[in-house]
Amino acid sequence: MAEKKNILTYEGLKQLEDELQDLKVNKRKEVSQKIKEAREQGDLSENAEYDAAKDEQRDIEARIEEIDKILKNAEVVVEDEVDVDTVNIGCLVRILDMEFNDELEYKIVGSTEANSLKGKISNESPVGKALIGARKDDVIEIEINGNSFKYKVLEIQKSN
């Protein structure tokens, strides 16, 4: 079975590439230095600094492997080419919460780069799934954990 594609915006791709570069060039050196300094302290069997540095090294290598895997299976959305007649990945969408009369704005992204605190929601999230394919003035209804939410699509635009 083919691996699932990791859908990324160009911004998300660039962030991952930058993080990978930092991990490989800077973080690896830093943790190697910490391990070297901890070794110089002598007995490694009761050396908390050594254990912490080795744990950090494992975390760094695991993150490098994770990013490599994401990038290997990446499908980049060209945001300039996104159709804004309907909500798609890469769009910026402004919606109205019909219960509270609040306007919300989200960028629809792939699950890898979703971050609700930054207004980026995944196309696989309940709200993202319901919004994909919606048009301006459409009302969508979502049920999450037994609660019903209604949103009206106010505007769809390119995110850049």
UniProtKB/Swiss-Prot annotation:
UniProt keywords, alphabetically: Coiled coil, DNA-binding, Transcription, Transcription regulation
Coiled coil spans: 2-81
GO molecular function annotation: DNA binding; RNA polymerase binding
Endoplasmic reticulum listed as a keyword: no
Disulfide cross-links: none
Keyword hit for DNA-binding: yes
InterPro entries: GreA/GreB_C_sf, TF_GreA/GreB_CS, Tscrpt_elong_fac_GreA, Tscrpt_elong_fac_GreA/B, Tscrpt_elong_fac_GreA/B_C, Tscrpt_elong_fac_GreA/B_fam, Tscrpt_elong_fac_GreA/B_N, Tscrpt_elong_fac_GreA/B_N_sf
Function of the protein: Necessary for efficient RNA polymerase transcription elongation past template-encoded arresting sites. The arresting sites in DNA have the property of trapping a certain fraction of elongating RNA polymerases that pass through, resulting in locked ternary complexes. Cleavage of the nascent transcript by cleavage factors such as GreA or GreB allows the resumption of elongation from the new 3'terminus. GreA releases sequences of 2 to 3 nucleotides.
Name the record gives this protein: Transcription elongation factor GreA
Native organism: Lachnoclostridium phytofermentans (strain ATCC 700394 / DSM 18823 / ISDg) (Clostridium phytofermentans)
